[in-house]
UniProtKB/Swiss-Prot annotation:
Alphabetically ordered keywords of this record: Lipid biosynthesis, Lipid metabolism, Magnesium, Metal-binding, Phospholipid biosynthesis, Phospholipid metabolism, Transferase
InterPro entries assigned to the protein according to its UniProt record, in alphabetical order: GGGP/HepGP_synthase_I, GGGP/HepGP_synthase_sf, GGGP_HepGP_synthase
Organism expressing this protein natively: Exiguobacterium sibiricum (strain DSM 17290 / CCUG 55495 / CIP 109462 / JCM 13490 / 255-15)
EC number(s) on file: 2.5.1.n9
MF annotations from Gene Ontology: heptaprenylglyceryl phosphate synthase activity; magnesium ion binding
Subunit structure: Homodimer.
GO biological process: glycerophospholipid biosynthetic process
Binding site residues for Mg(2+): 15, 41
Family listed: Belongs to the GGGP/HepGP synthase family. Group I subfamily.
Swiss-Prot/TrEMBL cofactor(s): Mg(2+)
Reactions mediated catalytically: sn-glycerol 1-phosphate + all-trans-heptaprenyl diphosphate = 3-heptaprenyl-sn-glycero-1-phosphate + diphosphate
Function: Prenyltransferase that catalyzes in vivo the transfer of the heptaprenyl moiety of heptaprenyl pyrophosphate (HepPP; 35 carbon atoms) to the C3 hydroxyl of sn-glycerol-1-phosphate (G1P), producing heptaprenylglyceryl phosphate (HepGP). This reaction is an ether-bond-formation step in the biosynthesis of archaea-type G1P-based membrane lipids found in Bacillales.
Pathway: Membrane lipid metabolism; glycerophospholipid metabolism
Name of this chain's protein: Heptaprenylglyceryl phosphate synthase
């Protein structure tokens, strides 16, 4: 049985713009992870997204699409995650791109599991920070953004995105304490079971991505943190 997003504890994230061999893909899909998110920051095409989806459909694992590029939106996923970068310096990445996408493909997704993500980007050196012109935040501001996303906007997912850098566990814990209904996702720098375990003591869900392409065995080891 495929788990819904609000029961995920461990998730792998695959970038359609990056190559992954079939043996590695099989290892990821059969690792015991709760789900696989398909998404990336740039060079995301429909062909690459469809190819990755078709390859993943051979395995009994939930597959979600992060709808960050209109061109890559397609049917066939178990869930559709719609990211709004709350600390973006431009409305384009808070609401404009999302509205544009739903204008074009919203009719196709009307009966699908469409889930909003309130992204807070916390690594100023990451590509996603540059693309979205993310504003630098202090700890109090991070907590306030998360509380706004949770209690006012009622977003089902609040996502702390460190994108390649390991974040501050105490800040993740502070964010978790103010959430009333949203699920806290954490992504960034999880490259060992120890880091996975540490972040899972605070976040509801950890997202493991970059390490897949650098050290597959280390990535696979993180799944055991949920046991």
């Amino acid at each position: 049985m495929l788990l819904p997003y609000n029961e995920w504890r461990h998730v792998f994230k695959l970038d359609p713009a990056k190559e992954i061999e079939e043996a590695a893909l099989q290892a990821i899909a059969t690792s015991g992870t709760d789900a696989i998110i398909v998404g990336g920051t740039d060079d995301i095409t429909l062909d690459a997204t469809l190819d990755l989806l078709m390859r993943l459909r051979r395995y009994p694992v939930a597959v979600a699409l992060e709808v960050s590029e209109l061109e890559a939106a397609t049917m066939g996923f178990d869930a559709y995650l719609t990211p709004s970068v709350l600390n973006s310096g431009t409305l384009e990445h808070v609401i404009d791109k999302q509205v544009e996408a739903l204008e074009e493909v919203g009719h196709m997704l009307a009966h699908q599991d469409l889930v909003g993500e309130g992204y807070i980007v916390l690594n100023a050196d990451a590509k996603v920070a540059r693309v979205t012109q993310a504003k630098l935040l202090n700890d109090d501001q991070v907590v306030a953004y998360a509380q706004l996303a949770d209690s006012v906007f009622r977003m089902p997912i609040i996502y702390l995105e460190y994108s390649g850098m390991y974040g501050d566990p105490s800040l993740v814990a502070s964010v978790k304490r103010v959430l009333k209904q949203g699920r806290l996702f954490y992504g960034g720098g999880i490259d060992s079971i120890e880091r996975a375990q540490e972040m899972l003591t605070h976040a509801d869900t950890i997202v493991v991505g970059n390490i897949i392409y650098d050290n597959l065995e280390a990535a696979l080891a993180t799944v055991a943190a949920t046991r």
